[in-house]
A protein has these predicted regions:
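Short S/T/G/P-rich N-terminal loop/turn motif that feeds into the first structured element of a domain
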Residues: 1-69, 76-88, 96, 100-118
Length: 118
């Protein structure tokens, strides 16, 4: 698990002033490829962390027994999310992980409710 530092209070206040735009990806890895996929995801996270304008944050949930990863990303705006999807750092990463994926679905989602911090 990777632990990050808390951003400065001004950044938190600015981020909370407008609701984020969310994207969720559900990824089923090919048999025997889960660990390799997760390792590449961690490398990508470290590569782009704090480098992409408009990205508020992300979470990766994993189910090793099922070979499934759920990625949740939040962006300042829908335009920021689209810009990220076209960013060469992202498209090149997709090319690297594509051979490890059995199936994947990505979708924009809206916050229905929120309780506590996750």
């Amino acid at each position: 698990m990777i632990t990050l530092t808390v951003p400065d209070p001004a950044a938190v206040v600015a981020a909370l002033s407008d609701p984020p735009v969310f994207s969720v990806s559900i990824i089923q890895t090919k048999p025997g490829k889960f660990d390799e996929f997760v390792a590449l995801q961690h490398e990508q996270f470290l590569r782009v962390r704090g480098q992409v304008q408009g990205v508020r944050g992300s979470r990766m949930l994993q189910s090793p027994a099922k070979g499934v990863v759920v990625l949740i990303s939040s962006f300042d705006t829908a335009q920021d999310a689209e810009r990220f999807r076209r960013d060469p750092r992202f498209t090149e990463h997709l090319e690297r992980v594509q051979p490890l994926i059995d199936r994947a679905e990505a979708m924009p989602v809206e916050l229905a409710y929120e309780v506590g911090l996750i």
